[in-house]
Every structure is written in structure tokens, then in C-alpha cells.
Swiss-Prot record:
Protein name: DNA mismatch repair protein MutS
Alphabetical list of SMART domains matching this protein: MUTSac, MUTSd
InterPro entries: DNA_mismatch_repair_MutS, DNA_mismatch_repair_MutS-lik_N, DNA_mismatch_repair_MutS/MSH, DNA_mismatch_repair_MutS_C, DNA_mismatch_repair_MutS_clamp, DNA_mismatch_repair_MutS_core, DNA_mismatch_repair_MutS_N, DNA_mismatch_repair_MutS_sf
Family per similarity comment: Belongs to the DNA mismatch repair MutS family.
Role this protein plays: This protein is involved in the repair of mismatches in DNA. It is possible that it carries out the mismatch recognition step. This protein has a weak ATPase activity.
UniProt xrefs under SUPFAM superfamilies: DNA repair protein MutS, domain I, DNA repair protein MutS, domain II, DNA repair protein MutS, domain III, P-loop containing nucleoside triphosphate hydrolases
Biological process (GO), any one: mismatch repair
PANTHER family, alphabetized: DNA MISMATCH REPAIR PROTEIN MSH1, MITOCHONDRIAL, DNA MISMATCH REPAIR PROTEIN MUTS FAMILY MEMBER
GO CC term (a single one): cytosol
HAMAP family with a match to the protein in the record: MutS (MF_00096)
Keywords linked to the UniProt accession: ATP-binding, DNA damage, DNA repair, DNA-binding, Nucleotide-binding
Organism: Yersinia pestis bv. Antiqua (strain Antiqua)
Phylogenetic lineage: Bacteria, Pseudomonadati, Pseudomonadota, Gammaproteobacteria, Enterobacterales
Superkingdom in the source lineage: Bacteria
GO MF terms, alphabetically ordered: ATP binding; ATP-dependent DNA damage sensor activity; damaged DNA binding; mismatched DNA binding
Amino acid sequence: MKNNDKLDSHTPMMQQYLRLKAQHPEILLFYRMGDFYELFYSDAKRASQLLDISLTKRGASAGEPIPMAGVPYHSIENYLAKLVQLGESAAICEQIGDPATSKGPVERKVVRIVTPGTISDEALLQERQDNLLAAIWQDAKGFGYATLDISSGRFRVAEPADLETMAAELQRTNPAELLYPENFEPMSLIEHRHGLRRRPLWEFELDTAKQQLNLQFGTRDLIGFGVEQAHLALRAAGCLLQYVKDTQRTSLPHIRGLTMERQQDGIIMDAATRRNLELTQNLSGGSENTLAAILDCSVTPMGSRMLKRWLHMPIRDIRVLTDRQQAIGGLQDIAAELQTPLRQVGDLERILARLALRTARPRDLARMRHAFQQLPEIHRLLQPIDVPHVQNLLSQVGQFDELQDLLERAIVETPPVLVRDGGVIASGYNAELDEWRALADGATDYLDRLEIREREKLGLDTLKVGFNGVHGYYIQVSRGQSHLVPIHYVRRQTLKNAERYIIPELKEYEDKVLTSKGKALAIEKGLYEEIFDLLLPHLPELQLSANALAELDVLANLAERAETLNYSCPTLSDKPGIKIMGGRHPVVEQVLKEPFISNPLTLSPQRRMLIITGPNMGGKSTYMRQTALIVLLAHLGSYVPADQATIGPIDRIFTRVGAADDLASGRSTFMVEMTETANILHNATEQSLVLMDEIGRGTSTYDGLSLAWACAENLASRIKAMTLFATHYFELTTLPEKMEGVVNVHLDALEHGETIAFMHSVQEGAASKSYGLAVAALAGVPRDVIKRARQKLKELESLSNNAAASTIDGSQMTLLNEEIPPAVEALEALEALDPDSLSPRQALEWIYRLKNMV
């Protein structure tokens, strides 16, 4: 049955459902019926699969059974959370009419639309992770990109110039939901993502976007936000804002401005670099053993989210970084003490967003009150700290004595979950509410008196007075004594072992009590809305306070981490270069069972590239990554895992470290490696930090060596980037003799018989030999295989003595036309052969072919 069949053939209720469904054809419609939300037709089938709920049928409409699935109203949030995680959206349709006065179906309407990117309910959100809605636009000039965190009001735009930059932005922001125009061309960029929403082109119209944004911010133009000429970004922002208004169906007073994010303000990292450095997600997709896992001991969820934003967008403004460093230094002695009241502040940022959307629940207001109660202690602790940035943040934190007093007077100590449960507003706040409550609360005494009186008067020891939601108040008598009740007892309900009655006096009291309860609840709801009206004018200061408290949490956390993990304050210099004494890998040193071996590093204009050799497992990758992480931490304003560090200007960090086949895109390991390498060679500058690990290993020996040599040469002589170049090609250790600014270093190892000990210490000069066979033995490769490998190694070394590999003149190498010595070519062909698969004739042909080669 299709939802758009002629409405006349359906029952009135299904007609109502189909009209509402027609307004929301793309998303699941949860249709309130009594104590359940029901889904019908294709929605029911889809929901039963997505949510693992039973698919049933409900009667018939238009002569056919109606597929139906449903969930209880009290557990709707759990099901919505599951849908949101799957990238799905849902429209929630409530009964707004009174069943008692309705003719035909009760009036219903969609009161909210839940989508992955627009949720603000704490039950649906991940506490320590941003939840972003994003929109993307693209034309010949580049990309426009907008993100909004509705749970904080943080609205950002950017204009990535090319596909690689756009891919990095998508990975950095990782939106829960992404709006894109119907004519979007590079679908490969986004098609693997959850929560994609295709939008019509007119929603990205520029003039409409400017109009919408000015209306939202109460401005005449967007010049004050610095985005007036950012036309690509504004198109995306306009579509995004319209979508939020459509789904939220309320004003959005907490979205008060727009910030342009410019690449040059931060250290640029492409998608591969973010992945390889394992900032917030490890290579397996989890969060264990990441930089965030070590660094994030924030005590508020909003602080944790801010720290992760800092990790993904390190900044270059030395003034801001110095402010943060000084604040961390100033907070070190009181960090633990400060974290006690901060922990009690909770997630004020998201509570304020729900207040702005008028969806804050009673417990949100109780938490807000509790947060206000912590502010005097925070002021007491921070006032003596003589650091300008700390005092600036403290002034933004403010004090909200009047609002605290309001919430202390208005909201009970431990409120219920929902306003409709009643009992939210404290006694003494409103005289009229107290009167109606007294009437309702007096029921218990009256009912006790009535029960005793009737039991004694009639001599019925089984008589008792009770109440249920369906039949209201009743007098219950056991079946055995029911023949003794007087005539004015009117039967209301028959049970298996008892009869329930009503009498005029009880009916009159029931009407009075139910009226008083209903009246009290109506007054309470009105007062609750009034409290919103009293709080909302203070929203800008409250948001500023929440942001300052989050930053204080991050800084106190970084102060505690610096003290606990023995980090030092780096020096940020305007002179090019990186000098690290006793550098350590922040994650590896925490995971290792034995002590971590710290290492120095020096890069300067005269020492731009380190060629790093040494055994596999010797620590080359760790040494390279720790350098990048120390540089990144310094540009958070954090202390760093080193005895001492001086960091010059850095504009980008690139990593070409390890690779796996990208099967989904049909790209081999080598193709992935070369794509990442091309990106580095096109975009690195003199101020970039480049990590190149084992470049060229995904192809044949000579192809790989040629590529590695040419890349190293290009980075050192043309780009002049600060480069750490790890390689297993010993031929590259001759580069320092041919080029300025290139230096050999190696990681030490000691070999004894067939065993090897990795020293993990970095020494000047090239490694003296390779330790591949020793590492293979350590990995458990059978002894006879190792023995055979040693024999083979000797043969190959004797064969290669005259080969060009050992005497390559790098200045004469070209990338594609290097001649491979015949003996080596024959050896490679022989190694590729499978003798068991050859027929006698083929084997004979191969013997002649190999003879011709040599």
C-alpha cells in the first residue's frame, strides 16, 4: 500500500496520519497513539529492521492490512538514540487535542524533528564529543563549508580551496549530519559518510542566505563577522541555518554569530596526518592509546570537547599560546583544588543550549543552580593567581547571584524528570499553586477518614478506598461481603475477587481533587515557562561564562598533566628550527612497561633533513611521531614531553607513515603512499614539518630507491622543509655528502649471535648495517628459514657488489629510466617464479630466458 493512495478510501485516523506523513516523506514518523508511538506502512517495515522491533498489522484501511510497529512513549529516547547513531532522522507527532472534546481523530501535529546533527537532548548526545551539523557547497572557485554545534551555538564557516583541504576539514570536524546540494559533483568525497542529506539548490541561494543570517543575528550586514565576501561559505551557512529552523521549530537565541576559520591561523594537517598521529582516534577506529586518551583528564564534558577541538586545530598565534602557557604555569599549584568545584559545574554549555531551545528539563535547571553555587569557590581560588589570562577568564566567569536565588526559590531540591510529572516548582514560590496543591494533597487525609468511617458504619472489614488512572477513586469490597453494601453504592468495576463502587460524596471529592491536580499542573507549567523567560535575557553572559569555565577546565587539566607526566614549558621562537632535548612520545611512554628512552632532535636552516636509519622495531617511527606530537602540543599552548624544547614557526605538519590498501576505493598500498607523497611535494613549504617513513617500499627495489632518492632531494633542495626521512635504503645515507642541510642519524641496536637488543637511542651518523634477519628471528620465524635467508643474503651481496645500487651517483639519477643491472634483473625474475606451477616445457623456456638476461 502506498502512502499517497486516495485519502477518501482510508479511515479518518489514517487520513490524518497520511497527511502528516506527506509533509515528512523522507524520515520516520512516530505517531502518538495513547501510550505508544506507532509507525505505519514503509516506516513500520524500516523501523522494525533498524530498531529490531516487531512488525505487526493493524486492522485494515482502504481494504488492506496496515503494517505497523510501535514503541512505548516512555522509552522513545532510547530508540531515537539508536536511530541517530545510524544516521537516521525522525519526526515526533504528538496528540495536542483533548480526546474528551474531539470529534473524530484527536488533533495531532509534529512537534519536533530529531536528526543526527540537530540533537540537543543529553540522552542522545555523546557527552565528551562535539555533535556537528554541516553543509557543503562547491563550484569552480572551490568549496564552501559551514558547521554548527546546536548544543553550544558554535557556528563556523570555511572556504577550503581544493579537494584535499576539504577532505581534511571533513575528517577534522567529522559531522554527524551533512547537507549537500543535489548537483554536488565530487560524491566520492562524502558518499561513505553517515547522515547525508541531499538538499535542493535553492536552499543554497546567496541572497537568501545573507538575509537569513542577518535576521538570525539581528544585523544589517555580515561585515562585522568578516564573512561578507565569503560567498561560497555563506551559501553553505544559509542552507544549514534554514535546515535547523525547519527541524527545531523554535527560535535559536543561542546562535549569535558566525566565525570564519582561516587556514593560515592554524597549523594545517591533512586527513592522512590526523589519522597517522592518532590524536583522538587510533588506527583501529577506537579511542584507546590516543593523544586525547593520555591528555584528557578534564572534569567537565564541555572542557573535554574544547580540548579535542584544540587538538584538531593547533594555532599559530604566539600571543594566545603564551597566554595559555602562563595560565598553565599559574594553575599548577592549585589544579587539583580547582578541579573540585569545576567538576560540579557539569555541562553548563549544553544546558544553556536546551534553555535557548526551551527544551531544558527540570533537572537541567537544578544542575544550572548547582553550577552557580560553585562560582564563589572558583573566584576564591583564582583571585590570587597573578596571571592576566586567568584573571580575564575569571571576569568572564562572572557571578549570577540573582539567577541562583531565583532557581533556589523556584525549583525543588531534587526535581522529577519532566514538568508534566508535577512537583517541580518549590513550595512558597507561588501562593496560588500552593493553594491548589493543598487541596490535592489533602486527599490522603480525607480518604483515610472516609475509609475508617464507612468500614465502621457498615461493619465491612474488607472495605478500602483506592485510586487508579482509568476509573478514578473507588471503594473496594471483597466479593464475599459485596451483598452487604447499601443501595447508594454504585458499582464502578468488577474484579475476580472484589467489587469496586463509587458514592456521590467520593465522586464530588474526586472531581475536586482531579480539578485541583490539573489546575496545579497547569499553573506549574506556566511558572516553568516564566522561569525560562527570566533566564533567557542573560543568555549571552551565561554562554560567555560557560566558555570561560570550559577553558579553565582545559588549562587546569593541562597543568595537572604537566605536573603528573613531567612535561616542560616549550619556548616558542620566531627563528626557524626545532630543538628538543630529551624528547619523549606522550602515548608510548605511558603504555610501555619499561622506561622510555628519551632522545634529542635538532632541525635548523643548516640542518633541514635527518636521514634516519636503523633496525625495524628500533624506534624510527616513534622518534618521528613524537617530534610531530611535541610540535603539535606546543601549538596548543600545552607543556610538552621533553626536558627542553624550542619550536620555531610551523605552518603545516605532514606525515607519510605506513599505509594499508584502500580497498573501498580500489587503491593499492603503493598508490595510497604515492598519493600522500604527491600531496606533500605539492603543498609543503620551508616552514613545514614533514615525516617520511620508508617511502618507496611498495614497489620493486630500484623503483622504490629512485623515488625515495628523488623525494628526499626535492624536499631538501627545492622545498627546504624540515624533514625527518626514515628509510631502509642505505644508499640514501650518501645524500649528506652531495647536499647541504642533510644529516644522517640512526637508532642504535646491539647484535649478539642471533639475538638483538634495541637501544632506542638516536645517534649521529648512518647505521652500520641492517638488522632485518635478527628482527625476523625475534619475531619467531623458524630457524631453518633464517639460516637459508643468511645464505641467500651472502649470495645476493656477492652478486650485487658490482651493481649500481651501491655506487649510485644521486645527482645523475632519474626517476623513470634507471638501468637495472642484468644479474639483479635475472635474480628478481627467478625469485618471482613458482617452480611447482611450471610444466617441463615452460621450465626449459625459463632457463633459456634467464641465460639471455645475464
